[in-house]
Amino acid sequence: MIEESGNKRKTMAEKRQLFIEMRAQNFDVIRLSTYRTACKLRFVQKRCNLHLVDIWNMIEAFRDNGLNTLDHTTEISVSRLETVISSIYYQLNKRLPSTHQISVEQSISLLLNFMIAAYDSEGRGKLTVFSVKAMLATMCGGKMLDKLRYVFSQMSDSNGLMIFSKFDQFLKEVLKLPTAVFEGPSFGYTEHSVRTCFPQQRKIMLNMFLDTMMADPPPQCLVWLPLMHRLAHVENVFHPVECSYCRCESMMGFRYRCQQCHNYQLCQNCFWRGHAGGPHSNQHQMKEHSSWKSPAKKLSHAISKSLGCVPTREPPHPVFPEQPEKPLDLAHIVPPRPLTNMNDTMVSHMSSGVPTPTKRLQYSQDIPSHLADEHALIASYVARLQHCARVLDSPSRLDEEHRLIARYAARLAAEAGNVTRPPTDLSFNFDANKQQRQLIAELENKNREILQEIQRLRLEHEQASQPTPEKAQQNPTLLAELRLLRQRKDELEQRMSALQESRRELMVQLEELMKLLKEEEQKQAAQATGSPHTSPTHGGGRPMPMPVRSTSAGSTPTHCPQDSLSGVGGDVQEAFAQGTRRNLRNDLLVAADSITNTMSSLVKELHSAEEGAEEEEEKMQNGKDRG
């Protein structure tokens, strides 16, 4: 008992799953019932993966399950309905790539429970064939024109006239879909639904039916149907326009432009929910846009329209012939003919080995006439397929195809059963078959060798693209040179560091010496000031020279000694700027300049070593690539 109650709860949860997910989308906040109904049914269509199945795949599934041979009022059980739905989704997965496979079991469960909730509210466990066809043809993907053509073929007689009673039955079935998504008060079936579609009781042909259903606006009871198709077309349309209410920088889907407010545009979410701001009101007329045109395109279109260069608008659908196509009578097109041998065109050989013509050769002259008959049959079918892109689902057409296939199968079976060949023909055919088998074996061997070569080349390419330590050891000479270059580079860097340290120490010593010289000069100046024999030219002291910033590191002390002292303290530069009064200053200047020259040569040597190392690395890498 506990298990049974648990299974019942699980079954009820599965039945309510689709409706729970639909309520979670919060479609009820949409203000207009037409958009609300279309959004709900579009959600059901995508959730059940019906948008991946077009009307032609549905017709094929109906034929595979024998629904085209049943009367519209025939009732089928839920188990058979599940079989039909299973065949639809399993065939769909065969057509889809492996990366886009769907969950077949989940899709079957969702669609089956939705159809039972919509068409078997009384719980009888049976649905009519017409209900199944109407629902699946309406909810599947594909073009609306193809769907309406198929629906009309199910409601018309042999003369191509619509039967109003069947159209009324179609409205009853298709309007159960809005009722199933809780929109029955807006789009439920009434007795006057047929009159709203066709007010005048007259003969309705295919073109008139298509004109009415695809008109703008369509019949009131079916206004949600073309809107659902438009929703599918504009789901991924991008509009680089800012919404005037929510200030979203861009829009996806529909775009609505007010006809009264200047440059007032709303995204579909704001328009569906009735949002308005500023001078705009919900009572203003809005224009729906399903695409975006730049101002340049609008201007060019306006100019072309004013000049009369715009082509006339194409009709919403092609014009189809008023009279339906007459079924082909296969008894006259493929008349029965005497059963003949497949080898009647061969020449029989006598025991002497001399080829002698017999009645087989005479019969070979009649073959062109039979081939002409078959070619005429094929040409007629090709013409029909060119005129009608896809043969509609009708029992008479299926019976003709079955009769044609059965006749050809019987002919081939009889020809295969009544074959009588002379021994010479059998031996000749045996030799030919043997040669063919040998040729096939040779081709298979060549194919196998080619595949092995392709696999070998692929492995070599993978090994070449992924270098390993073993491969790196294949050229020890290059590795040794690279190792020496790196070692030399390290040594040069260490030497440069040591020279920089020595330069810093020398600069410190220079600073100390210059301080001593400056102090000595100050003492001498003080003594000269205090002595009465001091010359008056030395009484006022001397001005301090301004430091000079160096722009060259390689100048000699005889031309511009200040250029050699860039980077040292101001005291050093000041001392050397006063002239060459002492040998100590000259010695210091020469030492500083030699340090600078040594550093320059070291830097150049280091750069040349680095460039050489880079060239060697490139050579080694090129050698690896060629290897």
Swiss-Prot record:
Q: Which residues carry this modification: Phosphoserine?
A: S394
Q: Which residues carry this modification: Phosphothreonine?
A: T11, T69, T179, T212, T424
Zinc fingers (ZZ-type) by residue = 238-294
Record-linked Pfam families: EF-hand_2 (PF09068), EF-hand_3 (PF09069), ZZ (PF00569)
Top-level taxonomic group? Eukaryota
Q: Name one GO biological process term.
A: synaptic signaling
**Keyword match Metal-binding:** yes
Q: Name one GO cellular component term.
A: plasma membrane
Asked if the keyword tRNA processing belongs to this entry, the reply reads: no
- Which keywords, in A-to-Z order, does the entry hold? Acetylation, Cell membrane, Cell projection, Coiled coil, Cytoplasm, Membrane, Metal-binding, Nucleus, Phosphoprotein, Synapse, Zinc, Zinc-finger
Provide the residue positions that the database annotates as binding Zn(2+) 2. Answer: C258, C261, H280, H284
Signal peptide start and end residues? none
Q: Where in the cell is it found?
A: Cytoplasm; Postsynaptic density; Cell projection, Dendrite; Basal cell membrane
Q: Where is the composition biased (Polar residues)?
A: 549-565
Purpose of the protein: Scaffolding protein that assembles DMD and SNTA1 molecules to the basal membrane of kidney cells and liver sinusoids. May function as a repressor of the SYN1 promoter through the binding of repressor element-1 (RE-1), in turn regulates SYN1 expression and may be involved in cell proliferation regulation during the early phase of neural differentiation. May be required for proper maturation and function of a subset of inhibitory synapses.
Q: What is known of its domains?
A: The coiled coil domain may mediate the interaction with dystrophin.
Q: What is this protein called?
A: Dystrobrevin beta
Source species of the chain: Homo sapiens
Q: Gene symbol?
A: DTNB
